Amino acid sequence: MSENLPNKAVFQSYIWTCAKYDFSPYEKRIIYRLIEFAQRWLEGIKIKDHMHKIEPSDCGVNITMPVASILRDEDDHNYAKAKAAFTSLSKKGAEYEDDKIWFYTAIIEHPKIEKGTGIATFHVYDPIWRAALDFTKGFKKYELVTAMKFKSVYAMRFYELMSGQTTPLFVPLEGSDGLRERFNLQGKYERVNDFRRKVIDVAKKELDKFSPYSFVAKEEKEGKKVIGWTLFPVFFEDREDPALQEQARIAKVTARLQLENNVYDYLKFSFDFKSDEINKNKKTLIEGQNRIPDFM
């Protein structure tokens, strides 16, 4: 059975959004969980249970998580799906290139499943872990539960592209930034109509069904040759998680409006905190104010 976890907003480095790879849906769910772990690490959130662990190593990190974390409301008899996904992912790599760098790296190694507990452990190579933590190229924000629902890896990748997108987005078919190379589909779906039917239409169908974000694709041509598509964002507001909407709304409100006057003034005038310092730590301060009597 799949693991039931509360929904959360995940911030994915644009390096991962634009990386070139060809993963199965199960392999992609391992990556989603890896990115979730990286976000917790970055936020300094301690994982307190024995089923989820991040342990630094000399050349990366060791991850522990339940096998159920990568399943989609399904049973996995004798861990067949999980074993296949971990084995396949350990033989694959990811490629990234921009105007300054190019790199290719293996992703994970030494996957292990404890059959009695259903706990998986694996090692993540350092460049992969650093890429998950690197937001210097920008990022995409998406809902983890929504991302885990998709059956098609193309739906997953288009969801990452379109999540939060408010303006039309041109995606070329060919070239180093093209969909064919980004999805590692060289030699497949050579006819444009086949590519659209097998990749874009499949992704759109799932996004239209499950996602708050979808798109309408307009074919773009140079002469008679199709060079790509402009994706016009479609937003289904009723599908967005209300709790995450509220979190986003609160995040925009300054600490001055959320902290009690005596708490805010005490921090500012007794400890000489600047307003931006209080804002950076407002989540912790608000929790303390709400939970601890006579907080200050």
What are the residue ranges of the model-derived segments?
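Charged, alpha-helix-forming regions
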Residues: M1-F295
